[in-house]
């Protein structure tokens, strides 16, 4: 995102938001605080929010009217099943975005027999200047709370059986709805999908989605890149579990370089599509968790993406990992939010497999070595060739280097690793020439860089393995040459037989 083009486009997006305010103050204090005691006792007879229920084969929602019990029966509401309700966000146009119907379809196809699928449609309130839509979030939250309170009173439906899924501004709407419920009757779960950042970042707990708004709150952050104090999505933790796919700042396949492709297809709408790509990725990650229940993306507790990229955070001990999306394990082990990181693919299915590599190099030279390596894997179910390895610094001494490698397919249990020094041929020729001049001693040419073993930890299975050089009499690495490492454990022969 350091590209000047990226900065310019993002600034343009921010200017659109700011200009829509017509001079209004851009700060959370300008929207007032929640008045829970004053507002929760008000039960509106009519709402500006439409509550739709989706049952059967039809895609057209059936509207439930507050205080009209007959509509519950007409729409097929089943009080013995949980309610999963979608809450959309700010709208540039006065129609619902396509992702809403995609999520409805995914929920119906995967969970139709076990949940009520609903939608809180607040188009007339969301299709406004951004700051006006922000002001309306409290009203919509109150109306959702009124619906849930009415369901509790009329058909004894407990709010603890409710799961609100809010995208962008809808995440904060869901939070407000939860705050208007009494402590004894809290909403069961709220999922925030890239909760809107402008006017909410760094706001108090009462002015945004927070862990207090439901028995369990999870959030997925996908577009938190910040410039001039603004970001489309919120960066700060706002839930019991906060997931940061690819670090949360941007998403694969959503680079601003894609803008040129979008311009050719969508014209000026390309800017909106490019920005929305990362913001809306949170939605598609959630939908993916429904459609590919057998390929759940695992995330890991970590301090930041830099440490995660070094492979230092692939532990599942004491609740340090969790699945992303609908099937997230609902735990509240402490009041402190847990930030979890993971890598994803650029398209569905988004799941990748995380591997921590620890390699101890022995540098026999006095000068730092900055080689480029590739690694190839052979597993019981497949193989992957020439995956590049990036070291954070040059190899200066006898030091252990840790880094993360991800695969987009399951190759099964690792059997063999091929490690290659991918220096260009010119460098290889120079290196060999130097070695013919410098007397390293008898035997084969020496590179001054040795590698004895590779330690691997698989995030998804928590399995640990050690790989040793196939030829323990030759541990030296050479430019443009490949070295094979095999499992050191006693069961390595059994593993080899699995692929025959």
Swiss-Prot record:
Enzyme Commission no: 3.1.1.3, 3.1.1.5, 3.1.1.32
Organism annotation: Bos taurus (Bovine)
InterPro entries: AB_hydrolase_fold, Lipase, Lipase_hep, Lipase_LIPH, Lipase_N, PLAT/LH2_dom, PLAT/LH2_dom_sf, TAG_lipase
Region (Essential for determining substrate specificity): 254-277
UniProt keyword Protease present: no
Subunit structure: Homodimer.
Record field: catalytic activity: a triacylglycerol + H2O = a diacylglycerol + a fatty acid + H(+); a 1-acyl-sn-glycero-3-phosphocholine + H2O = sn-glycerol 3-phosphocholine + a fatty acid + H(+); a 1,2-diacyl-sn-glycero-3-phosphocholine + H2O = a 2-acyl-sn-glycero-3-phosphocholine + a fatty acid + H(+); 1,2,3-tri-(9Z-octadecenoyl)-glycerol + H2O = di-(9Z)-octadecenoylglycerol + (9Z)-octadecenoate + H(+)
Renumbered residue ranges of the record's region Disordered: 23-44
Gene: LIPC
Molecular function, one GO term: lipoprotein lipase activity
Any one cellular-component term (Gene Ontology): high-density lipoprotein particle
Keyword Signal among record annotations: yes
Positions bearing carbohydrate: 67, 78, 363, 398
Cellular compartments annotated: Secreted
Stretch forming the signal peptide: 1-21
UniProt keyword list: Glycoprotein, HDL, Heparin-binding, Hydrolase, Lipid degradation, Lipid metabolism, Secreted, Signal
Biological processes per GO annotation: cholesterol homeostasis; cholesterol metabolic process; cholesterol transport; fatty acid biosynthetic process; high-density lipoprotein particle remodeling; low-density lipoprotein particle remodeling; triglyceride catabolic process; triglyceride homeostasis
Location of the PLAT domain: 353-487
Stated family: Belongs to the AB hydrolase superfamily. Lipase family.
Protein name: Hepatic triacylglycerol lipase
Pfam families, per the entry: Lipase, PLAT
Function: Catalyzes the hydrolysis of triglycerides and phospholipids present in circulating plasma lipoproteins, including chylomicrons, intermediate density lipoproteins (IDL), low density lipoproteins (LDL) of large size and high density lipoproteins (HDL), releasing free fatty acids (FFA) and smaller lipoprotein particles. Also exhibits lysophospholipase activity. Can hydrolyze both neutral lipid and phospholipid substrates but shows a greater binding affinity for neutral lipid substrates than phospholipid substrates.
Active site annotation, chain numbering: 168, 194, 279
PROSITE patterns linked to this entry: LIPASE_SER, PLAT
């Amino acid at each position: 995102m350091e590209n000047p083009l990226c900065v310019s486009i993002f600034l343009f997006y921010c200017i659109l938001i700011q200009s829509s305010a017509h001079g209004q103050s851009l700060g959370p204090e300008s929207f007032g605080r929640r008045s829970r005691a004053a507002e929760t006792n008000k039960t509106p007879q009519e709402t500006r929010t439409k509550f739709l229920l989706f049952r059967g084969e039809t895609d057209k929602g059936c509207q439930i009217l507050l205080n009209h019990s007959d509509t519950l029966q007409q729409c097929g509401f089943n009080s013995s099943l949980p309610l999963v309700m979608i809450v959309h966000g700010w709208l540039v146009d006065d129609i619902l975005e396509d992702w809403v119907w995609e999520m409805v379809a995914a929920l119906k196809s995967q969970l139709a027999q076990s949940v009520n699928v609903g939608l809180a449609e607040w188009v007339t309130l969301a299709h406004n200047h951004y700051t006006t839509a922000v002001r309306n979030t409290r009203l919509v939250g109150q109306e959702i709370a009124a619906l849930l309170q009415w369901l509790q009173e009329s058909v004894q439906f407990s709010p603890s059986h409710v799961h609100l899924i809010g995208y962008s501004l809808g995440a904060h709407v869901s939070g407000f709805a939860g705050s208007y419920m009494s402590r004894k009757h809290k909403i069961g779960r709220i999922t925030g999908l890239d909760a809107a950042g402008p006017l909410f970042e760094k706001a108090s707990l009462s002015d945004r989605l927070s862990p207090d708004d439901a028995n369990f709150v999870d959030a997925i952050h996908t577009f938190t890149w910040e410039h001039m104090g603004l970001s489309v999505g919120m960066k700060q933790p706002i839930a019991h579990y906060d997931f940061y796919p690819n670090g949360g700042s941007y998403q694969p396949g959503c680079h601003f370089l894609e803008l040129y492709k979008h311009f050719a297809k969508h014209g000026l709408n390309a800017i909106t599509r490019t920005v929305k790509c990362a913001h809306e990725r949170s939605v598609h990650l959630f939908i993916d968790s429904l459609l590919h229940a057998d390929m759940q993306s695992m995330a890991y507790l970590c301090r930041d993406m830099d440490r995660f990229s070094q492979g230092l955070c692939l532990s599942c001990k004491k609740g340090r990992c969790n699945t992303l999306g609908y099937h997230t394990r609902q735990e509240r082990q402490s009041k402190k939010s847990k930030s979890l990181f993971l890598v994803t693919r650029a398209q569905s299915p988004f799941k990748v497999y995380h591997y921590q590599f620890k390699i101890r190099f022995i540098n026999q030279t006095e000068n730092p070595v900055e080689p480029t390596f590739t690694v190839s894997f052979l597993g019981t179910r497949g193989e992957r060739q020439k995956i590049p390895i990036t070291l954070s610094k040059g190899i200066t001494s006898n030091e252990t280097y840790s880094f993360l490698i991800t695969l987009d397919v399951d190759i099964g249990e690792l059997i063999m690793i091929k490690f290659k020094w991918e220096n260009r041929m010119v460098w290889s020729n120079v290196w060999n020439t130097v070695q013919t001049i410098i007397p390293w001693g008898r035997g084969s040419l020496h590179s001054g860089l040795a590698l004895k073993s590779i330690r691997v930890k698989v995030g998804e299975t928590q399995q640990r393995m050690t790989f040793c050089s196939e030829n323990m009499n030759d541990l030296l690495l050479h430019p443009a040459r490949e070295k094979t490492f095999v499992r050191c454990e006693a069961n390595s022969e059994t593993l080899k037989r699995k692929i025959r």
